[in-house]
């Protein structure tokens, strides 16, 4: 996130209150996932999901995504929490959802996965690098193949595409417009106007 965070002032019968913009959005059950997905960002997103679940498990949560992707295990912590809580999580792509960002976009509640018209969505296989002895590199290669299989299985389920198509399409960077992502099954609708 940017180092500059705007503040908003709300007037109530008890006076004025100042919020940073992200805290104010959280009051409306909006979470911003912006930037590279790493353990720190994932911990913040998970905490916000759990907080909103505790506040009201019957109300939807809106996860806005603008991300180039990031660490698979960090993304899985967000994914698992989205599935663990009772509240539906609606996903909305603003800007781009690439790699793990696209994966999370596809994991929103059925019928509640959206993208703005000029969004860019990209899926591919997980990236990794290994150094060390040959045995260590082999262990890392097996693990990345295991993660790739999990990601592809979940994408196939979310998109209703055949696993073989997902495997082929994720072999290299596969870019889509918002309309193409809808046709592919990654999202349910391209938003022209706010749905709130």
Curated annotation (Swiss-Prot):
Gene3D superfamilies, per the entry: 2-enoyl-CoA Hydratase, Chain A, domain 1
Catalysed reactions listed for this entry: Hydrolysis of proteins to small peptides in the presence of ATP and magnesium. alpha-casein is the usual test substrate. In the absence of ATP, only oligopeptides shorter than five residues are hydrolyzed (such as succinyl-Leu-Tyr-|-NHMec, and Leu-Tyr-Leu-|-Tyr-Trp, in which cleavage of the -Tyr-|-Leu- and -Tyr-|-Trp bonds also occurs)
Principal EC category: hydrolase
InterPro entries: ClpP, ClpP/crotonase-like_dom_sf, ClpP/TepA, ClpP_His_AS, ClpP_Ser_AS
Keyword entries, A-Z: Cytoplasm, Hydrolase, Protease, Serine protease
Location relative to the cell: Cytoplasm
CC annotations in GO: cytoplasm; endopeptidase Clp complex
Entry's EC annotation: 3.4.21.92
Highest taxon listed in the record's lineage: Bacteria
GO molecular function: ATP-dependent peptidase activity; ATPase binding; serine-type endopeptidase activity
Catalytic residue list: 99, 124
Function of the protein: Cleaves peptides in various proteins in a process that requires ATP hydrolysis. Has a chymotrypsin-like activity. Plays a major role in the degradation of misfolded proteins.
Name the UniProt record assigns to this protein: ATP-dependent Clp protease proteolytic subunit
Species this protein is from: Campylobacter lari (strain RM2100 / D67 / ATCC BAA-1060)
Annotated gene: clpP
């Amino acid at each position: 996130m940017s180092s500059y965070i705007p503040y908003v002032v709300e007037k109530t019968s008890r006076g004025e209150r100042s919020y940073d913009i992200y805290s104010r959005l959280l009051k409306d059950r909006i979470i911003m996932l912006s930037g590279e997905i790493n353990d720190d960002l994932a911990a913040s997103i998970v905490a916000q999901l759990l907080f909103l679940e505790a506040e009201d498990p019957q109300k939807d949560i809106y996860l806005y995504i603008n991300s180039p992707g990031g660490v698979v295990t960090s993304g899985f912590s967000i994914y698992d929490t989205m599935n663990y809580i009772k509240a539906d999580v609606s996903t909305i792509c603003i800007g781009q959802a690439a790699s793990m960002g696209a994966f999370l976009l596809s994991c929103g509640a059925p019928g509640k996965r959206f993208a703005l018209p000029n969004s860019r969505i990209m899926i591919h296989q997980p990236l990794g690098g290994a150094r060390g002895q040959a045995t260590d590199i082999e262990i890392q290669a097996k693990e990345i193949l295991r993660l790739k299989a999990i990601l592809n299985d979940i994408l196939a389920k979310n998109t209703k595409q055949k696993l073989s198509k997902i495997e082929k399409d994720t072999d290299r960077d596969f870019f889509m417009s918002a309309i193409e992502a809808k046709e592919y099954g990654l999202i349910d609708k391209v938003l022209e106007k706010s749905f709130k």
